[in-house]
């Protein structure tokens, strides 16, 4: 389950970072 969790995290991380950067600006 750890492998699939990392895959999901890798997919979600860029979206979360993108939203965070948009809110910063």
From Swiss-Prot:
Database matches in InterPro entries: Antimicrobial_4 (IPR012523)
Localisation per UniProt entry: Secreted; Target cell membrane
Disulfides per UniProt: none
Residue intervals passing through the bilayer: none
Tissues in which the UniProt entry reports expression: Expressed by the venom gland.
Gene Ontology terms, MF aspect: toxin activity
GO biological process: defense response to bacterium; defense response to fungus; killing of cells of another organism
GO cellular component terms attached to this protein's record: extracellular region; membrane; other organism cell membrane
Pfam families named in the record: Antimicrobial_4
Keywords assigned: Antibiotic, Antimicrobial, Cytolysis, Fungicide, Hemolysis, Membrane, Secreted, Target cell membrane, Target membrane, Toxin
Job description of the protein: Has a broad spectrum of activity against both Gram-positive and Gram-negative bacteria and S.cerevisiae. Has insecticidal and hemolytic activities. May act by disrupting the integrity of the bacterial cell membrane.
Similarity section: Belongs to the non-disulfide-bridged peptide (NDBP) superfamily. Medium-length antimicrobial peptide (group 3) family. Ponericin-W subfamily.
Protein name, UniProt field: U1-poneritoxin-Ng1b
The species this protein was found in: Neoponera goeldii
